């Protein structure tokens, strides 16, 4: 019986020195390099883009540079008084269950009063969010907003090479190119595919090859899983 390697869902590495720069994130990185000299009066920056474009990883680059505190929720005005940090990161920022509009209005006033800064990460620009509180709406529309687009080919190729290298896998350039041209263009998909391809290669006891990659990236993976379990798939 063929032993199947455990499916390990390794968390993405957000080490700041592992962040790879490219055309899609170049301007966002320039904004971070300009910190703390962000536009007054609130000195806040909104980086927005689709899921998996690298916003969270970029926030760790900012955290290392600024020592910012991660603020995961702000529901009540009374919480403002307990904020001891001056610089903040608000990841996955949405004005719903975790952040109330009234509390955020006072949060921006707090930033202006203390000379603090805030990095807000969201899928859409905060300037385009549906805000009922007019005073908060005006504040969100006054802060700098920078989009991160889906990664271009070169950036995605570099990221895939590094992900495989982190798993001690050396993968031919042609295989990387095939992946880039046949996958969804985001880092979340890249993490998932690399993990699945690594597992498939370990199961087959062979190095990562184009044949293995094609099998993993097939729309119907049921046949692949069945063959690996029964050890009768030639790769």
Functional labels for PLM-detected ranges:
Residues 1-34, 202-235:
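A short, basic N-terminal segment
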Residues 40-58:
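Walker A/P-loop nucleotide-binding motif
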Residues 63-74:
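Post-Walker A helix-loop "phosphate-sensing" segment adjacent to the P-loop in P-loop NTPases
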Residues 81-122:
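Conserved nucleotide-sensing/catalytic segment adjacent to the nucleotide-binding pocket
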Residues 126-141:
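Short regulatory helix/loop adjacent to the ATP-binding pocket of P-loop NTPases
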Residues 143-155:
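Conserved AAA+ ATPase "SRH/arginine-finger" region at the nucleotide-binding site
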Residues 170-182:
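Short conserved motifs of the RecA-like P-loop NTPase core
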Residues 183-197:
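The conserved phosphate-sensing helix
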């Amino acid at each position: 019986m063929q032993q199947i390697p455990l499916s390990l869902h390794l968390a993405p590495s957000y080490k700041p020195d592992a962040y790879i720069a490219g055309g899609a994130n170049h301007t966002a990185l320039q904004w971070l390099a300009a910190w703390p000299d962000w536009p007054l009066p609130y000195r806040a920056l909104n980086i927005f883009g689709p899921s998996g474009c690298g916003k969270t990883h970029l926030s760790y680059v900012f955290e290392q540079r600024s020592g910012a505190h991660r603020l995961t929720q702000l529901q009540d005005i009374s919480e403002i008084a307990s904020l001891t940090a001056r610089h903040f990161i608000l990841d996955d920022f949405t004005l719903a269950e975790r952040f109330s509009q009234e509390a955020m209005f006072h949060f921006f006033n707090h930033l202006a009063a203390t000379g603090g800064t805030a990095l807000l990460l969201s899928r859409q620009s905060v300037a385009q969010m549906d805000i009922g509180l007019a005073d908060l709406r005006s504040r969100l529309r006054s802060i700098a907003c920078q989009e991160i687009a889906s990664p271009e080919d070169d950036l995605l190729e570099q990221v895939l090479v590094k992900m495989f290298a982190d798993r001690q896998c050396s993968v031919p350039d042609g295989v990387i190119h095939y992946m880039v041209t046949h996958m969804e263009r985001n880092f979340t998909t890249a993490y998932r595919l690399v993990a699945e391809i690594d597992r498939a290669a370990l199961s087959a006891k062979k190095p990562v090859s184009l044949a293995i990659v094609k099998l993993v990236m097939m729309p119907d993976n049921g046949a692949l899983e069945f063959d690996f379990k029964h050890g009768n798939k030639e790769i």
